[in-house]
Amino acid sequence: FAADGNAAETSSESGTKWRADFRSDKPGKWNYIVSFVKEKQVAVELQLAGTPVSPFDGKRGSFMVAQAKQSPTGFLTEGRLQYVGKRCLQFTGSKQYFFKVGADSPETLLAYKDFDGTIARKKKVPLKTWGPHLQDWKSGDPAWQNGKGKGLIGALNYLAEQGVNSISFIPYNAGGDGDNVWPMISPDEKLHYDCSKLDQWQIVFDHAQAKGLFLHFKTQETENDDHKVGHPGNPGHAPAALDGGELGVERKLYYRELIARFGYQLALNWNLGEENTQTPRVQREMAAFIKELDPYDHHVVIHSYPDQQDKVYPPLLGDQSELTGASLQNHWDQAHRRTVQWIEASKKAGKMWVVCNDEQGPADGGVPPDPGYKGFSGKAKEKQREYDLHDIRKHTLWGTLMAGGAGVEYYFGYKLPENDLGCQDFRSREQSWKYGKIAVDFFKSFSRDVIIEEMRCHDDLVANTKHDNSRYCLAKPGKL
């Protein structure tokens, strides 16, 4: 439902317009048929046929899509990014494999004052202005309502210019750490979606894709996924949890709205949840519902607490679920070992997962800012030792890639400057972005050759059977 058809500009709350968004993954003639039906719960019960609404239901037509012009950035010339049963996602057009280096933080990316209906419910987590990136907005870039959106659009420009190719965000964090992002008109109206806000999000997501930024939808977080409380998962009550943690009307509608409004984008994944604590049954049901509903078959992953991976992932491997990958959270010096573990476990189960390192411990530190950024030393303290961006580069970035992982997203901790909830200046980690670009460019330079996909972690060839950080080996024995 699109309200008046121009809600991003008008902030309209009502209207008669319905819109289908589509982005083709190949040029040529495309045919369409309209399905427009009504029935109680027809939007959430996929087996309901519904009653046709005349004269719209059944209308047919066609249109031509021309070959996209070559562009130095963006996904429009690559085709759709898909899971192909291998350890990396692959573009349908270019056949290029995708290795990511992205920003996991801030998880409150969408907590932006320029979006309609967006408020801060915690004094310590105010809305963002993205002021430091106003300088990065360029003439011709999108905005809405007489110049709104320039800060966030500029932030995306900056990331793309640094070689970053992925952003992560939580579109529903009601009751969570940020408690300032939701697609509905309010957290208490779980079945009433905000058309103008979502159209403004769409402008941002469209620009991200045009700049070559993969969209990582972390659809919920541990504080609002179910009624279990905190890391131990003690019994409690979370009013913001959709259907109390089950797959019911609220959650099904949430997935449908996300897929209907944003699923046409070429490069994204759906993440069942950050530090997810729902049961294996519900996790399987959620993944299956998304798989059935999403016409583009986007990549589906799940994120877990580091010390709960051995509990969460095994019941989801192979044909036990529709998941196609894991979004790992590990201590920065455990990325290699844990990436190897889940790639090998998924292979053994009969369905290779795409495994990425998307959050780095310790929780208070993560990836530290650059040395000299606003006087910062560059060193993060952890118990009896210190670490810096070079440790992240060696053991998180290269440790993941040399394990056969498909890339990283960097988490900014909660104590350091420009942290996970408060970050508004991506220049705080500029050197880490540059190191990431070097690594991704290295793998992209020969990833059209199928041999890169055939390579596996072979630490045994360099006498590292424990997969520690002493040395790494990615190889196809006898070839490379």
Please annotate each region the language model reported.
Residues 330-346, 363-365:
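Substrate-binding surface in catalytic domains of secreted glycosidases
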Residues 293-301, 351-359, 364-367:
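Short beta-strand/loop segments at the ligand-binding rim of alpha/beta enzyme cores
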Residues 1-65:
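Ligand-binding face of N-terminal immunoglobulin V-set domains in extracellular IgSF glycoproteins
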Residues 218, 303, 358, 410-411:
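Generic beta-sheet signal
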Residues 296, 318-325, 349-354, 403-406:
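Glycine-enriched alpha-helix->loop->beta-strand junction motifs that scaffold or abut catalytic
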Residues 354-355, 362-369, 380-382, 389-480:
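Aromatic- and carboxylate-lined catalytic core of secreted/periplasmic carbohydrate-active enzymes
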Residues 39-41, 53, 60, 68, ...:
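Active-site mouth of glycoside hydrolases
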Residues 184-185, 230-241, 368-389, 421-425:
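Short, flexible/disordered intra-domain loops and linkers
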